[in-house]
Each structure stands twice: as C-alpha cells, then as structure tokens.
Amino acid sequence: DDSASRGLGDVYKRQRIGMKTLKIEELSKNFGSTEVLRKINLEIDEGNFLVLLGPSGCGKSTLLNIIAGLETINEGNVHIDDYNVSKVEPKDRNIAMVFQSYALYPSMNVRENMIFGLKQAKVSKEKIEEQLEKVSKFLQVDALLERKPSQLSGGQRQRVAIGRALVREPRIFLFDEPLSNLDAKLRVEMRREIKKLHQQLKTTVVYVTHDQTEAMSLGTNIAIMNHGVIQQNDTPENIYNKPSNTFVADFIGSPSMNLIKGNLKESSNKVSFNTCLLYTSDAADERR
C-alpha cells in the first residue's frame, strides 16, 4: 500500500532529525575467564544497514544482545542517539528486536501480537489502532489480523514479527538471524522484503547473520568478526574486493580467495614477490 508506505516513511524521517549514530567504544565482554568481545569500536551512521557477519562463536550475537541491553558489559560504552545507554534497561533504549524464532505469543492472534508492546507502554488506543493499520497494510498482513501464529506460514510469521517491531517506531532495529528458520526460496523472498523495507523507511538496522549472501545483498556496511574482534568494517564491495587481512580474504566468497605465502622484496627500485611451493614426495608423485 503506497499511502501506508509514505506514512511510515514520513514518521521515520521525522524521527531521524537530530539522530546521530549508534556508537560503541572500547567494548569488552567476558563470560567468566573467556573473553568474548575485545575492545570493540563501531560507529553506525544514521539510516545505515550494518550486518554483523562471522563464523559461529565469533561474538556477533553477543554484541547484538549488548546493544539491546540483554547482556551486561565489562568495559566500554554504548551510545544511542548521543546518549550513553550502557546501564539503561532494554525497555528504555527505544530499540526493537526481531528474533530467529519469531517469538510470537501462540495464544494471541496477529493483532494482539503486533500491539502487545504498545499496550505495555500504555500508548493511547487511537495511536495503537493508527499504527496497527499503517504497519499491517505496509507488510500486507492486514487480512491476517485475527489468525493465530499456528495458522500462518513461516514468511507470514516473520512479517508479523517485523510488524510488531515496526509499530513501536524504534530508533534502531536489531535482527538476530531472522531468516535462518526459513527454506531457501522463502529466504530469498524475505531478503527482498527486508531490503525494500529499509530502502523505504531508511531506518538504522543492525543485522546478525552467518550467511554471506544475506550480508552482501542487504548491508550498506558489513562488520566481519572473528574471535571477538572486528576484522573489517566496510562496504560489501570493499569487503569483497579489498579484504583487510587473510581471514577476511579466506572467509568471504565461494570459493574463497586463493592465498599464496611468499615474500615481497625491493631491489633496484623494483618490487618482486618470491614464493617457494614445496611438495612432499606423495604430492610430487601425484603431480607427475
């Protein structure tokens, strides 16, 4: 619905006046003696779509939970809208989160699920109905409002989960691997919808995934993580064409980039790359 889309877009444009960035400074997190995040520094421009990408156990979901206020930090600060929210409760951070498991209440219908957060915040009935109408039309779930989650497809459930976040008009959207439970065809469709959503609303998004295709197609920026450290934070094009280190070069792409060990030498104003490939006798026999 074009009018619903324009209405929501206007709301988010008004919200973004004066909004700066999400800024993370020198952030560290330990679980006991295990260091999960190490001196993370990250700044996200308003309206950007940042994807946190990395292998399992790299710390990306922990970082997202810290932004949401679901995890405490050992060192550093988190700023939203120029305010230090490091010790602010999740409900007071003006963020909305979409989970991998949808996290819909099975006993509630779509309408009740979408407006639950607004009712908890004691928003007026008129405002609730206004937001519900706009968002449900925008996400094309307005015909599903009386259905229970068990009566919806995976894609419909994901749209409802996104709608529940949208009605709150948050400063920042946090997505925690929202498409990983969907089949391949539906993942492609939902990627397209999330991309369209961001292009129309221009909201600030932090999105966690281990799927490179998702990251490259959705993000305006990608922060690649490994062992609790951001290896590179750049545009998808630069991540792919100009990796900052061998981990990024080997991690991105299928097949990954070929890496050859060698030495750079300068002599007589010329630079040469010298390498020596050594083979075992078995490998040499195979080559013959």
Please tell me what each predicted stretch does:
Residues 68:
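Helix-to-loop junction immediately C-terminal to a conserved catalytic motif
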Residues 74-77, 127, 227, 261:
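Conserved coupling/switch loops of ABC nucleotide-binding domains, chiefly the family-specific signature
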Residues 92-96, 100-247, 251:
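ABC ATPase nucleotide-binding domains
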Residues 244-281, 288:
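ATPase nucleotide-binding modules
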Residues 1-15, 279-288:
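Single conserved hydrophobic/aromatic residue that forms the stacking wall/gate
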Residues 76-84:
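Conserved ABC transporter NBD signature motif
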Residues 53-55:
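The feature captures the beta-strand-to-loop junction immediately N-terminal to the Walker
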